[in-house]
């Protein structure tokens, strides 16, 4: 394992599929007698050759027809896809007759790159079911290679090998391969981000998987929120019940934070600012979602803003960043987006939490839209919401759990008070908990609002990746009619 690369453990569940059957053409060898005249031999050999050629051509035609049929039943057509890459064999079928297909999603985040390999089964005339997921991740994120693009290819190839090992060979050429980059690349200068994406696309094009012109892109914040909403509602079963109740989602990443839910109140739709509503079509139904991503309000970017720094820029003249959210005696260094900052606390004229809350409120002022309907919608929260809650014992670190929004404030006050006299190994804990507490209240959540915090539902990670590949495959099916 090369230095600087750290892998997460993979997770697999078993699946069943039938190996593709051999073609219907069976040739039988029989011995041709050498007795007889030379004339008989001259006729027999050419005749046998012709029969063999006929059988071979017929087999090839049958093989291509079934492969093409399988390809279109999985993904109708991707714009710019390499059409020579149809599946070698018919679509896999589980023992119960359900169709089997795969999707690969690369999540290029601000702190690392992760590959998700999904296997789906689809009962006849029903919505698909996720039956298998494998993921692995490596650090750092793609943005770390902004000044040395060639180095980014090695990690991408290593993660592609994970997909090759997990997906049966006969499915490779019909399996969509997609990379979506999030806040890490959004914050890079446009030219640097595009060079990274072009390098990844080149690596993808050389892979054996199905690659379209849109296989590599920077995901806008709204789509990130929508994809996470799909994941949560797919895993909870809400998408399988037309008109059934749905749940909202809260995602707190390093560079951005998202909120998404399905409004049931007309007033929410009318009061939403431009860009906060998006139409989503899934399973032949259309959903009008409230979804928005706040770039710069992810936990790491918020830290920098609270410290008084500027994204992507070192402190002027190496100046130390001083914050009321740190222990008064703290001095140290903090690295963010490949920039190292010198940071320190300051003497407190009041309680640490009180001063920190005032500073966080300044950062959040007029940055977040508040909606009343969130009070009445069940919400799942994950990513840094989960990590922070688990870190201070509000939920079980492995199983997750439920809490009320006010628990974050209680934890923040306790940690901040402790830091005033006993500097801890987590110098940013007071700042982070205070930030999350006030962010949730800015969204409109009362302190008594219950949130469900989880990393997994039915042993599947609650990230946007599942929703994104699911939506991608669904859109491919709509772009190409069966008759084409």
Curated annotation (Swiss-Prot):
<dbReference type="GO" id="GO:0004382">
    <property type="term" value="F:GDP phosphatase activity"/>
</dbReference>
<feature type="disulfide bond">
    <location>
        <begin position="325"/>
        <end position="356"/>
    </location>
</feature>
<comment type="similarity">
    <text>Belongs to the GDA1/CD39 NTPase family.</text>
</comment>
<dbReference type="GO" id="GO:0005886">
    <property type="term" value="C:plasma membrane"/>
</dbReference>
<feature type="glycosylation site" description="N-linked (GlcNAc...) asparagine">
    <location>
        <position position="220"/>
    </location>
</feature>
<feature type="disulfide bond">
    <location>
        <begin position="416"/>
        <end position="430"/>
    </location>
</feature>
<dbReference type="GO" id="GO:0045134">
    <property type="term" value="F:UDP phosphatase activity"/>
</dbReference>
<feature type="topological domain" description="Cytoplasmic">
    <location>
        <begin position="1"/>
        <end position="39"/>
    </location>
</feature>
<dbReference type="GO" id="GO:0005576">
    <property type="term" value="C:extracellular region"/>
</dbReference>
<dbReference type="GO" id="GO:0008894">
    <property type="term" value="F:guanosine-5'-triphosphate,3'-diphosphate diphosphatase activity"/>
</dbReference>
<dbReference type="GO" id="GO:0005615">
    <property type="term" value="C:extracellular space"/>
</dbReference>
<comment type="subunit">
    <text>Monomer.</text>
</comment>
<keyword id="KW-1003">Cell membrane</keyword>
<dbReference type="Pfam" id="PF01150">
    <property type="entry name" value="GDA1_CD39"/>
</dbReference>
<keyword id="KW-0735">Signal-anchor</keyword>
<feature type="active site" description="Proton acceptor">
    <location>
        <position position="224"/>
    </location>
</feature>
<keyword id="KW-1015">Disulfide bond</keyword>
<keyword id="KW-0378">Hydrolase</keyword>
<keyword id="KW-0472">Membrane</keyword>
<keyword id="KW-0333">Golgi apparatus</keyword>
<dbReference type="GO" id="GO:0017111">
    <property type="term" value="F:ribonucleoside triphosphate phosphatase activity"/>
</dbReference>
<keyword id="KW-0460">Magnesium</keyword>
<dbReference type="GO" id="GO:0036384">
    <property type="term" value="F:CDP phosphatase activity"/>
</dbReference>
<dbReference type="InterPro" id="IPR000407">
    <property type="entry name" value="GDA1_CD39_NTPase"/>
</dbReference>
<dbReference type="GO" id="GO:0009986">
    <property type="term" value="C:cell surface"/>
</dbReference>
<dbReference type="GO" id="GO:0032026">
    <property type="term" value="P:response to magnesium ion"/>
</dbReference>
<dbReference type="GO" id="GO:0005794">
    <property type="term" value="C:Golgi apparatus"/>
</dbReference>
<keyword id="KW-0812">Transmembrane</keyword>
<dbReference type="GO" id="GO:1990003">
    <property type="term" value="F:IDP phosphatase activity"/>
</dbReference>
<keyword id="KW-0325">Glycoprotein</keyword>
<feature type="glycosylation site" description="N-linked (GlcNAc...) asparagine">
    <location>
        <position position="284"/>
    </location>
</feature>
<keyword id="KW-1133">Transmembrane helix</keyword>
<dbReference type="GO" id="GO:0000139">
    <property type="term" value="C:Golgi membrane"/>
</dbReference>
<feature type="transmembrane region" description="Helical; Signal-anchor for type II membrane protein">
    <location>
        <begin position="40"/>
        <end position="60"/>
    </location>
</feature>
<dbReference type="GO" id="GO:0017110">
    <property type="term" value="F:nucleoside diphosphate phosphatase activity"/>
</dbReference>
<dbReference type="GO" id="GO:0051592">
    <property type="term" value="P:response to calcium ion"/>
</dbReference>
<keyword id="KW-0964">Secreted</keyword>
<protein>
    <recommendedName>
        <fullName>Ectonucleoside triphosphate diphosphohydrolase 6</fullName>
        <ecNumber>3.6.1.6</ecNumber>
    </recommendedName>
</protein>
<feature type="topological domain" description="Lumenal">
    <location>
        <begin position="61"/>
        <end position="484"/>
    </location>
</feature>
<comment type="function">
    <text>Catalyzes the hydrolysis of nucleoside triphosphates and diphosphates in a calcium- or magnesium-dependent manner. Has a strong preference for nucleoside diphosphates, preferentially hydrolyzes GDP, IDP, and UDP, with slower hydrolysis of CDP, ITP, GTP, CTP, ADP, and UTP and virtually no hydrolysis of ATP. The membrane bound form might support glycosylation reactions in the Golgi apparatus and, when released from cells, might catalyze the hydrolysis of extracellular nucleotides.</text>
</comment>
<keyword id="KW-0106">Calcium</keyword>
